[in-house]
Structures are given as structure tokens and as C-alpha cells.
């Protein structure tokens, strides 16, 4: 990624983290136009893990002039963004579905149960599907 940014073929990343990077790593990233965004605020997930709250991440990015972002990740990222506390932050979703097993031992993409009760399911509107090789891309909006 850094080489692509140096060559002018891509933009350098902004890396959001809770840990202060080494001066050397920060300098390497800044030299190509990227930066580390260190957020010390912490939140607890429903599984009891410590994380940075999505609201803090997205507000900080918005303060830097960014109105729309792409967030890449697997089932854990998708589930955390589509959870009841974060779903209002998301307008649209683009998910690549690969022909691999889902569920136990695979990628689990569904809201976790909270104290034995079910949570509302995020339902996409205005969906579009596109096959790309063996994969399928699903696009849709959560809100009108």
C-alpha cells in the first residue's frame, strides 16, 4: 500500500488504533500522506472484549472531512457494525460472499443473541447482486 501511494497509484491509509505507533512507523506513513489516528476511548463489546467504539471512530474521521468510507473486514466487523447499537451509523452495505462454509467453524454473520433473546435483523433494501467469478457481491441500503 505504501509503495502504491509513493508511486501515486493509490492513497496512503489512515490507520485507526488504540496504541501509539512507533515514531519510525508514523514517519513512514506520514511520508506518503497517511497517518495514524490514535483513539484512547474504549468500549466493551457484548462478548466483554475491549474495543474502540464505532461512533468515536466515525466521528473522528468525519471531523477530518470524510463523509463516506469503506470498512473492510470479516464476520466480526460486519456483526459489530450491524449490531443494535451501531446499525444507525450505517447507510449502505456491500458484502462479498465467497463459496465457503458459514457458521460453526466458518464465518458467522448474524447478530449475537443477547441474554437468550433474539435481536432485530438488519434487512437490506434496494438490493443488487453481482456475480464476479465464484464470488457474489450483495449491495443494499439499511435506510432509505
Stretch-by-stretch model annotation:
Residues 1-144:
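Enzymes that bind and transform nitrogen-containing heteroaromatic metabolites
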Amino acid at each position: 500500500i505504501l509503495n502504491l501511494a509513493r508511486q501515486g497509484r493509490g492513497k496512503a491509509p489512515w490507520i485507526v488504533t488504540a496504541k501509539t505507533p512507533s515514531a519510525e512507523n508514523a514517519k513512514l506513513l506520514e511520508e506518503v500522506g497517511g497517518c495514524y489516528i490514535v483513539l484512547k476511548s474504549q468500549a466493551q463489546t457484548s462478548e466483554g472484549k475491549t474495543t474502540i467504539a464505532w461512533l468515536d471512530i466515525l466521528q473522528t474521521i468525519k471531523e477530518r472531512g470524510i463523509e463516506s468510507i469503506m470498512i473492510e473486514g470479516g464476520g466480526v466487523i460486519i456483526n459489530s457494525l450491524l449490531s443494535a447499537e451501531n446499525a444507525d451509523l450505517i447507510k449502505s452495505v456491500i458484502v462479498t460472499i465467497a463459496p465457503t462454509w458459514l457458521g460453526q467453524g466458518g464465518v458467522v454473520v448474524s447478530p449475537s443473541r443477547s441474554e437468550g433473546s433474539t435481536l432485530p435483523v438488519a434487512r437490506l433494501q434496494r438490493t443488487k447482486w453481482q456475480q464476479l467469478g465464484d464470488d457474489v457481491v450483495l449491495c443494499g441500503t439499511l435506510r432509505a
